[in-house]
């Protein structure tokens, strides 16, 4: 993707995250870029086309991050073996990388804020919010704990909620924080403690079975 196309996507996303999708016009996007609407339409057909490409870009980045962190890229139904092979060390690294990505990467942070802002106004935005920030991550971790740790679905679901609940909260805290670095440190610490507690409890359980 060329630089101009990337610039259009990021600029549009900034405006969507600040003003909302419906309230942002193609004229506003073009004006923020210092170009005419005619020039903008040479790259994207309309505002909807811009948004569709933003979502496509997020899907690409999502898969790339999972691949880089040695985590399952697809669903449990399609790649069950990838879930079984995943280590808790990899899950810990990935979780911290995800927090940094959703808060520190401008493209991802703006996308998150857009979905948070629009989830109650637009059914599609609500679905994307659930996919990327709520039910999607919770289900992903449930599947991971079920196969990687050999837990039943009920226990895996409880573990996933115990893990992801604080992480989800830290996203909201980060956005209004006077000291974002301190929030990042606290979020990373919470993730580390979760996996440390899991290892400790797992060792105790293993010893009691001997």
Q: Where are the predicted features?
A:
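Short, basic, alpha-helical segments at the C-terminal edge of helix-turn-helix-like DNA-binding modules
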Residues: 56-62, 69
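Helix-turn-helix
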Residues: 7, 11, 15-57
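Amphipathic alpha-helical packing segments from all-alpha helical-bundle domains
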Residues: 103-116, 120-150
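Short, Lys/Arg-enriched anionic-surface-contact patches
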Residues: 1-4
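Short alpha-helical scaffolding segments that buttress acidic/His motifs in well-ordered protein cores
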Residues: 98, 112-116, 163-167, 194
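Hydrophobic alpha-helical connector segments
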Residues: 66-105, 159-160
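Hydrophobic/aromatic-rich alpha-helical bundle segments in the mid-to-C-terminal region
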Residues: 127-131, 135, 145-193, 203-210
């Amino acid at each position: 993707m060329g630089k101009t196309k990337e610039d259009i996507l990021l600029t549009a996303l900034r405006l969507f995250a600040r003003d909302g999708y419906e309230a942002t016009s193609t004229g506003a996007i073009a004006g923020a870029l210092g170009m005419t609407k005619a020039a903008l339409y040479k790259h994207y057909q309309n505002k909807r086309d811009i948004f569709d490409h933003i979502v496509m870009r997020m899907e690409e980045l999502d898969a790339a991050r999972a691949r880089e962190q040695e985590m399952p890229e697809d669903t449990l139904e399609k790649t069950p073996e990838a879930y079984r092979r995943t280590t808790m060390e990899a899950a810990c690294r990935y979780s911290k990388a995800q927090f940094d990505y959703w808060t520190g990467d401008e493209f991802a942070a703006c996308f998150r804020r857009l979905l948070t802002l629009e989830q109650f106004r637009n059914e599609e935005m609500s679905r994307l919010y659930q996919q990327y920030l709520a039910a999607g991550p919770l289900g992903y971790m449930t599947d991971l704990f079920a196969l990687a740790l050999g837990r039943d679905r009920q226990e895996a679901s409880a573990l996933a909620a115990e893990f992801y609940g604080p992480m989800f909260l830290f996203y909201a805290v980060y956005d209004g924080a006077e000291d974002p670095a301190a929030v990042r440190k606290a979020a990373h610490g919470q993730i580390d403690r979760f996996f440390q507690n899991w290892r400790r409890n797992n060792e105790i359980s293993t010893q009691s079975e001997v």
